Amino acid sequence: IGVASTKAFLGQMLGMYKIAYSLNGKEFDNQKIVDYIKRVLELDTLIQGIASQYYLYQNFIYIGRNTNYPLALEGALKLKEISYIHAEAYPAGELKHGPIALVSEDMPTLAICPQDSVYNKTLSNIEEIKARNGKVLAIATEGDEKISKIVDDVIFVPKVEEELYPFLIAIPLQLFAYHVADLRECDIDKPRNLAKSVTVE
């Protein structure tokens, strides 16, 4: 039984989406999400290759705006849990209030930047990081040629309605952490100092 429970994150998110859709008088299309997730899972080999370029780093920054910020938190948590890399997530809009001081060639950033309502602002944050010699890996929308010219590496996910991006972005974040941990020869199913259930406060 794996301690780093990726299914719990996706399951909770799916449950919340179904409640939100129901309260809005809409029906959530499970099959649509399943089909998109299958497409994202086909990126596994690509993500493994990208992970091979980052697994030796000891520190990582994750950034995102709006719903992408909680995803950044999940991505950073998974990376630190199973690969033992120090990873911190920040709202992209807060970069200039402190976190940008951490940017360097030795501390890459994973930027969540799909083509959504905050795309241009997040892209501007990425440009600020690149201007300070930071290395950036982005998760972006298929066909986004603009971001390809700015970042060092990119994982593309299918273009969907804005509210569905979290499902497509969570998978690459989790796969990236998995492959980094695997390359570092960490025990992915049983990370050190962690237990499946927390029994003490």
Task: Walk through the language-model features, giving the residues of each.
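Active-site phosphate/pyrophosphate-binding segments
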Residues: I1-P108, V118, R184-E201
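Phosphate-moiety recognition in structured ligand-binding domains
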Residues: T6-K18, G25-V34, P108-E201
